Amino acid sequence: MAAKKSSSPNRGFKVADQIQRDLTELIRDLKDPRIGMVTLQGVEVTPDYAHAKVFFSVLIGDGEASEEALNQAAGFLRNGLFKRLHIHTVPTLHFVYDRTTEKAADMNALIARAVASRSKDDDAA
């Protein structure tokens, strides 16, 4: 017997997008001073909706402290999602500090130094 296919193959992506939008609003209302200026980068939801990884970056503040504070507030945020989402299972939230922006800035700085060094070498020759 063939496995039953989901009636909406994009449902997981839609749920993840809705979770991201709702969490953005809920996090804005948190009063924890450890949470800096947080930007949610993306949400990955398991197929059974039991867990969701929430990737975020921090413009202002400490990323590790924000990660700890958000994971401590995960139950409160999940409860807020229960009130907003109309799905049977609201996933357990796991916040992950996304260092991609920092790494990109470091890479750009290295490239700029290499270009500056090369132009100095060309001028000297």
From Swiss-Prot:
Pfam families: RBFA (PF02033). The keyword Transport does not apply. It is found in: Cytoplasm. This is Ribosome-binding factor A. One of its GO terms (cellular component) is cytosol. Its main location: cytoplasm. InterPro entries: KH_dom-like_a/b (IPR015946), RbfA (IPR000238), RbfA_dom_sf (IPR023799).
